[in-house]
Amino acid sequence: QWTLAQHLALSGPQAPVATGLLGGPEFTARSLSPRIHGLLARRHGLRAAYLRFPSAQGARDLEALLALGLRGLSVTAPHKRAAAAAAATLSEAARAAGAVNTLLRAERREGPVWSGHQLDAEGLVRGYSDWRGAASLALLGSGGAAAAVLLAARELDWREATVYARSRAPAAELAQRFGVRARPLQELPAARAELLVSSLPVDLPAELFPQPAGPTPRALDLRYGPQTGFQALARARGFAVRDGLAMLVHQALAQFELFHGCR
């Protein structure tokens, strides 16, 4: 639930330029996005506010936040597909992914609308350019972040992608959208992966871990912060490991530029 102070901060003649983060409560609570956007605003001397908007019902809250006058929103799990559906227009990348992580206010004669953008993929391309090239990609998960991985894979030359997920219908839809394979998560132990990417919000059980392949097997956990169980297991299996902080920082830089016109 949003506080009265947050509502008041968005109104009045002295109100700052307001943006924020919309997502599930468990994701907005631990996100570093407010800190990053705050640091960027101070660096540029901007009067700006970046607020957390924990939400269990993304579509309805997107309408309310548009009415409040926000200039833009960062969108995190589980609302990236709902945000794409709520946007009046989509960037080319957002349309290709079917999910957005950024909404920008656009004024129309009939009233304001959201335009949707996909900047997670840009964050991946900029943040992991030194991991360019992989003969096989095992991607865990089938949500909005997974779509961004497959979009970035085209530029990063991550080939032969297979989506592994518990929920078959979303995985099949994602695989069809990008022309890759989809398999049940239970089949992952039989796989060999040169690049293993987890977009899951939880750790992968040890018994489901695949075998590394190629001369330089790598594993990327899109979560960031203290070492996760996934990262520890990947190291133990022989993968070089990185977390998702570089993606977060680079997509935040792109978001800030979209919101404020400076990076």
Predicted regions, residues:
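Short acidic low-complexity segments
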Residues: 179-193
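Conserved acidic residues
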Residues: 71, 194-195, 217
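Rossmann-fold NAD(P) dinucleotide-binding segment
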Residues: 82, 203-222
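NAD(P)-binding Rossmann-fold cofactor-contacting core
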Residues: 156-178
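Glycine-rich adenosine-cofactor-binding loop
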Residues: 23, 118-121, 128, 134-158, ...
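Rossmann-fold NAD(P)-binding glycine/threonine-rich loop
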Residues: 218-263
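Short, well-ordered coil/turn residues at beta-beta hairpins
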Residues: 76, 197-200, 222
